[in-house]
Amino acid sequence: VHELIEEGLKIHLPNATREERYERVLETLLEVGLEEEMAFRFPHEFSGGQRQRIAIARAIVLKPKLLILDEPTSALDVTIQGQIIKLLLDLQKKYAMTYMFISHDLRVVRALADYVAVMQHGRIVEAGPAREIFNSPRQPYTRRLFAAAL
């Protein structure tokens, strides 16, 4: 796992020493709720929720301003989904990151989004502040989608 997380550092911070990269990886593991000793285990040894935390660690180790998350809570049980959502919200506040969050799970979107774009057949049919879209959808497709999913 250490090597997976370190990969981006080697490419984007080529002048960082091995020790600096090592410390950054361990710090990032702790930030996503994993223990330092987990750095030396293999991915197949982790649960689905832990693997998702590792994926998040890989993405945030470089402290990006924008993070694109494609279905980050799919295939996780509801309890673990809640933990991952809380982690993402905490990291967003800590690092002032913007998320582009792609999901079919409207409950998760409602919990995370400030701004929503609803797509139908690959095109945006409605967009605006999340509260506005969820409370008063204007487009028939959006209304049907919310009625079916919420």
Language-model segments: residues:
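Conserved ABC ATPase "signature" region
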Residues: E19-E37, F146-A147
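Conserved ABC ATPase signature
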Residues: F42-F46, Q50
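Hydrophobic anchor residue at the start of the ABC signature
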Residues: I56, I84
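A short, proline-enriched helix->beta-strand linker immediately N-terminal to the Walker B motif
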Residues: V61-K65
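A short, surface-exposed alpha-helical micro-motif characterized by mixed small hydrophobic
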Residues: V109-A111
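Short, glycine/charged-rich "phosphate-handling" switch motifs in NTP-dependent
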Residues: Y115, A127
